[in-house]
Amino acid sequence: MAKGLEKFNELVESFANLPTIGKKTAIRLAYHLCINNQIDGMKLAHNIENAIRFIKPCGQCGALSENELCEICSDEERNKNILCIVESPKDILTLEESQSYNGLYFVLDELNEEKLEKLKQIILKLNISELIFALTHSINSDATIFFIEDKFKGLNLTFSKIAQGIPSGVNLENVDLISLNKAMNFRTKI
């Protein structure tokens, strides 16, 4: 680290603590904001402060929100009969960007009795008819799906999970064997 530049070094360290940012990138970012574009630096600092102060989990689904209920849970145009279970609020952002789903969400970031009771209350309150699991494909996810399906089997729900397979533009040699196996077993007719 640069001697005599404590504030700069602290900024570099803060950037380097972020996911996917290495030390070289952290130095470039810090230099850019301190020297090349101080206005962007001040705007970034302000935006970070506001985001930390005002963004919180939605009281119903766990999505990112600036209000008690997020825009999705408040939207009367959404299909309120289907509920997509995700692992993280980031997953909601990704699914919303895809414009492939118009129902509600529930963030299941950990499997405990409190979360399961909250999920059950939402299912009953909103008269949910289908749970869609959009979880990372793994043995743990399969166990979670099986557990929830078993726990809520008396609630007259349809259970489904998102399809698995080969991403667009990826060569077969670069696909893991589990994904390749599932893609073959769950192939569709054309």
Curated annotation (Swiss-Prot):
A single MF term (Gene Ontology): zinc ion binding
GO process terms (BP): DNA recombination; DNA repair
InterPro entries attached to this UniProt entry: DNA_Rcmb_RecR (IPR000093), Rcmb_RecR (IPR023627), Rcmb_RecR_Znf (IPR015967), TOPRIM_dom (IPR006171), TOPRIM_RecR (IPR034137)
Cited PROSITE patterns: RECR (PS01300), TOPRIM (PS50880)
Any Pfam family hit: RecR_HhH
First and last residues of each zinc finger (C4-type): 58-73
Keywords: DNA damage, DNA recombination, DNA repair, Metal-binding, Zinc, Zinc-finger
Domain Toprim: 81-167
Family listed: Belongs to the RecR family.
Function: May play a role in DNA repair. It seems to be involved in an RecBC-independent recombinational process of DNA repair. It may act with RecF and RecO.
PANTHER family: RECOMBINATION PROTEIN RECR
Protein name: Recombination protein RecR
